[in-house]
Amino acid sequence: MRLRHIAPVALALAACTGREPRSSSACSDCGTVVIAATGEPSTLLPPLVFETIGRDVGDLIYERLADLAPGGAPVDTAAFRPRLASSWERVDSLTLRFHLRPGARWQDGRPVTAGDVVFSFDAYADSVIDAGARPYIAGRIKAVAEDSATVRLQFAEPSPEQLYDATYHVRILPAHIWGAIPRASWAADTATAHLIGSGPYRFRRWEHGQSLELAADSLASPMPAIRRVIWRFAPDPDAALNLILTHEADLLEQIGTPDRVSRVAGDKAYWVVPYPSAVFGFLSFRLSDANGRPHPVLGDPAVRRALTLAADRPLLARSIFGPGTQVPTGPMSQLLWISAGDSGGTAYDTLAAARLLDSAGWVRQGNTGIRRRGSQPLRFDVLVPATSSTRRNVAVALQEAWRRLGADVNVTVVDGPVFQERLGAGRFDSYVGAYLDEPSARGLVDQWTRSGWGGLNYGRYGNPAFDSLLSRAGRETDRQRSAALYHEAMDTINADAPAIFLYALTNTAAVHRRLRHIVLDPFSWLATLPRWTIAPEARLPRDSLR
């Protein structure tokens, strides 16, 4: 498999190249960006954030020690860029030393210190906070202040992703604010005055259910030309799209299905901008129950392989999600650094699928056309969440394809909380799911190995050979050798067919044409917003800073 490389600049609009942002007092290229968003964050405090919109907002207020460049591999130490730390060096195989940016200050004017870094790592590791990143920090990384501007990170074991673990998961918090508040009370703390970071934007106001506003911080150097960032909250994707179509918003992260994209494309005020997504979708089979009893139908690998052969994945992916959607080579998005691009997966071959079922004893009987093996019909259910019309469309398309193969398939649509409860309890035959990748391939361990049973591996797939390959790949320090091991693991999981890997999305954003210097980072689409500008000749009334 060929290792695909994503360019360091995720996407740059050709029409937006030119001069760098200015910071003069006149600021003719300054203004406001309004973002249409579906839903709103439950919190902005980074250790408690689980929604992508909360991350998008928080990452403009708070900073990491360093940033991974778009397209960079977590094992590549040259792919990291200074952020709150101006430099770092390796001390030994278990230790990294970071030097904080000279003059770094919190937005209330207090200096950022190594003590803040120590405090932040401790908070992320605390079971009381139970941050999403806690498994990567607790018992694995210890922060020690060497002086006020130098911090040493000590790791429990060697790993090629130490720099990634030291910088990607933790946003640095002000100890002088949060250290005085019991951690058990953090989630209930609603004091917006506590939302103080060291990043380029400061919190300004939040009208719950309506909007949230950030303002460029005067201490930032250079001060961003986009002086105000406003999120307009919509209850559903249609309402968010309407904010674009009525010109009330400048940006929409994901327009959606092809028919929706065509509506925006017809509006001359906006660019329609495709860029790779970190999302991949799949249909997962339940191979066994909690007691180890194989599923009467889907526990048979011949059935799973036949169902995979009978699914025209390229057609399904592009007809439902639009051009640019790929069929992944395994459980990964287009962005994961080990991705080999659009392979088409296992070839679409309905004749081969039928022969495979025949040879495994699943034969058509009677006038129904439904296959049976003994008294067991080839019958199962596909569970989908009501919150995703596209996943429902995927399930219905597969249902029809498998009906022609001789399978009796029912599609069950349930509310989101019920969907999650049934997955956790193992009360399903199969389900259409989607995962959001992070840059590291280690998420595969939680999703598809034996250690993920009771966690994200709802289908209870477990192959020691696959688990071993992932473990070896995660310990390998050489990028190419690591990728080769991951690819061998993908060949193994595809042969076992515990799931059908259906689509790796391409996002399509709506971007107002007056915006300049736009670069969209697929892992954090607003990360470069502090460097954006407004075309002076195209300024709108909302760009006024008065």
Residue map of PLM features:
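Sec-dependent bacterial lipoprotein signal peptides
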Residues: 1-14
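Extracytoplasmic/periplasmic ligand-capture domains
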Residues: 16-27, 101-133, 143-145, 192-195, ...
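N-terminal lobe/hinge region of extracytoplasmic solute-binding protein
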Residues: 36-92, 122, 194-198
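A short glycine/threonine-centered beta-strand motif
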Residues: 37, 61, 98-101, 155
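Short, solvent-exposed loop/turn elements at domain surfaces
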Residues: 41-48, 73-76, 161-164, 212-213, ...
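Surface-exposed binding/hinge segments that line
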Residues: 89, 133-180
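Active-site-proximal polar cores
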Residues: 502
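Long beta-strand-rich cores associated with HINT superfamily self-processing modules
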Residues: 509-546
